């Protein structure tokens, strides 16, 4: 889901759908400057992650924000995305929040640190990652506000931003 959110065109589509759910693929394509085919592909990716849903009216396909079929862990991400886009948070800020969680190893590190604050050495012992890989992922998590270094250990932080906060909660509760 984070990889899908971390894309400027898809965020633009989400924002357009929030503003006017009556637009079809052709309208959305014209609005963001992509071909209808490329726009359709981006919309399908958003549908596949339950961030939007498609509704057919005759031959025309319209999209609305959210999906009644979304699994429970997606609902907070839908709400956070909607809040972020509704208040005009810049796409790059939303993308930065999402990219903290675009790699499974960063998600695992957030979960491990949530159970017990840890040093890099302790994380190496608990995982199948090298110290250099852990350090690289921790740097990204720290830069995006997901972890902090305190008392010689990494601790989970309360990241700023609607999406980062929702992602952190979903990951820790998983």
How would you name each of these model-derived features?
Residues 19, 60-96, 155-174:
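Conserved segment of winged-helix/HTH DNA-binding domains
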Residues 34-47, 128-143:
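Short amphipathic alpha-helical interaction segments
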Residues 48-57, 64, 144-152:
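Beta-hairpin "wing" of winged helix-turn-helix
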Residues 88, 122, 133, 139, ...:
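Positively charged, low-complexity terminal tracts
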